[in-house]
Amino acid sequence: MSNTIVIVYLGANRIEIGRSADACPQEIIAWKTGSINEKNREELKKIFEHYFQICNILGNREVQVLILEDIFISVVEKRIICSILFKEFDCAHVSFVPRAIVHCLSCNTRNAIVIDIGTNYTTCVPIFDLRPLQQFIKYSKRGKRQVESRIPLPGSLYMPIFFDEEYNSKNCEVDETPVINLVKNIVESLPIDLRRPLRENIIIVNIEEAYETVIRNLFKLKMDTSKIQFPKNYWQAGSACAKILLHYKGSNIVGIERDEFYNNPHIAPDWFDYYFRTGVKRLQ
């Protein structure tokens, strides 16, 4: 069964694809466009086709796919993905799970603020009991592209993303807020009983190991945060997630089946829909 479960990690600048039985992705492909649309639909199709061919699963109607998605992926993008996987490759099932939840699972926690440093922007996603707290999600345009052209001091490459001594909320756009300020804003806006468990458990994604110590110390200094984690085994967590979700017998409410898609080709799973929020219980 695990040989027919395919995991797809949709990153800000890359796509990783592999089987759930493997310890790491088999293919890592640059995806510079970031978003998915009709213009790059054919390119995405070729990525899937190449992988299905090398794994000898092209034409296998039992293939199930789990998409580890960006928290801001649109329903339109999901429809394109589903259309490719169902119409072009006749897959049996497609499920979507926010990457932030998988990173929590990889860190063996149900509660955290997950910071994902992307190419064009950075997201801060509060997770409680493995549920994204939608109304408290924030993002900043401070991403990797902003610091790529800089010549940083040793260990300080990501400093402008996380902290800015000259930052003044009155003079800056809301979407240009440094990440540490975003996290503070999230914590202050949370219900009182949720503040401590999330403030004390920060997960940071897409930071090179050489910069981890600097960022960890910065958070401890500016936020008195007790636990900073940089997940390394998200692929294994995604595999475990796939086995739980895709082996569930019955109505899988975080994904759609082939027949369901053909009955309604406009359908697309939306994690923030009420029924999808209740479905997270199956990850326990």
UniProtKB/Swiss-Prot annotation:
Disulfide bonds: none
Location(s), subcellular: Cytoplasm, Cytoskeleton
Main localization, broad class: cytoplasm
Biological function: Pointed-end-associated component of the dynactin complex which assists cytoplasmic dynein by increasing its processivity and by regulation of its cargo binding. The dynactin complex is required for the spindle translocation late in anaphase and is involved in a cell wall synthesis checkpoint. May regulate the association of the dynactin complex with the plasma membrane.
Subunit structure: Self-associates. Component of the dynactin complex composed of at least ARP1, JNM1, NIP100 and ARP10. Dynactin comprises a short rod of the ARP1 filament attached to ARP10 at its pointed-end and probably associated with the capping protein at its barbed-end. The rod is implicated in dynein cargo binding. A sidearm formed by NIP100 projects from the ARP1 filament and is implicated in motor binding. Interacts with ARP1 and JNM1.
Family: Belongs to the actin family. ARP10 subfamily.
Name this protein carries in UniProt: Actin-like protein ARP10
Organism: Saccharomyces cerevisiae (strain ATCC 204508 / S288c)
Phylogenetic classification of the source organism: Eukaryota, Fungi, Dikarya, Ascomycota, Saccharomycotina
Primary gene name: ARP10
